[in-house]
Structure formats: structure tokens, C-alpha cells
């Protein structure tokens, strides 16, 4: 869309702020490649608003399963070999994501940062890790090791996402950070340093193994959806693999 005052199709920042909020406008800026012509219309803004809702749902899930608490964790004290393989794989994902974040941040490719963070939240977390571990969080004994290990990961994920998203979702991350630090109004997410992840979290062999599992899982889910669409089964629980 080429905006022109003479055509009367200009979308003012004030209009965007009033309808969508400041962070949606910030997402539009962050998601745009400044090396190309910038495009904006209400359809594009609605797409960003939908992505924002998914991100808020990710934060809501993390907060709900951590009881609105965020603990300070010394990463060097984590015995990674004692964690389930799935948790080790997610730590590997976090390590790689942080490497990409620093690379893109230092080269001012903010749109690539946003793209990778959004993909991590919607694909790696919501559609994969959260989906697999929901039974553990909701059904296992409160103090079981498996559940505690999962909550450890959720704590690390929440802390990392708040710091990564702070330059983009400035108001949302501050709102969440204030919720987690009710007793200290002087604290701000924008004063926190980025995490430094141990090299031991990087595990290429583990990633290769889990990628095969993910490929099989995706194929199975695709077949299940086809069977549901054809009314062969009513629920995925009825499928035999």
C-alpha cells in the first residue's frame, strides 16, 4: 500500500495505537525489513495482532505453570545429564536461539530476530514442548522429578523470552516483569542483562535424534487429521499407531 495524503489513505500512528496498542506498532516496525519498501495496511496489522495474541498465550502458559514466580537460576549448576532428553533438547534450542539473537542483533537484523522468536514460541513451544509436557504438568505428582525438571525449563524459557522480547514488546515484557516482582517497583526488565548459556547445552547429535522424532510425529499428526476430516475417527485418542 502506497500511502498518500492526496489519496486519503494514510494510517496515522495514533490510529494504530488507539486500535491495537503500542506493542503491535512496535511489532510492525520490528518485523519489517528496513532494506525494502515498508508495507502497512489494516490486514498486515491484524496479522501482527494475531501473532501478538499467540505470544501473550505463550507467556500466560508459562506464568500459569510457574504460579507467577520467576526464580534466579545459576545455569552452571544445572546437571544437564540428569534432565530428561526432551528438556536437554529444549536447552539446545535455547542455546541456538541465543546465538542467532546475538548475531542478528549485532547486524541490526531485528526482523530476523522477531521471526525466529515467533517461530520458537508457536512451533517449538506451543505446538511441541508444551503439548508433550502438559500431562506431566497437570497430572504428575506435584513434587515429582519429571515435573520439577519441566518447571525448571519453563523458568529458564520465561526469563529468556522476557529479555529477548524486551526491545520489541517493551510494554508487555515490562508488564509481566512487574507482575513477577510485585515487591520491588524499582526493578525493570530493561535493566536486566541477557543470559549467557553454557556451551554444554549445545548438542548437535541430540538435535539430530529429536528431529527424526519430530518428523515422525508430524507425519502421524497429519495422518490423524486426515482420518478426522474423513470421519474415520472422532478424536486423536482413537487412533492406533
Segments predicted by a language model, with ranges:
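Generic structural concept
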Residues: 49-52, 56, 91, 95, ...
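Conserved alpha/beta core surface patches that mediate binding of polyanionic ligands
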Residues: 9-13, 115-119, 123, 173-182
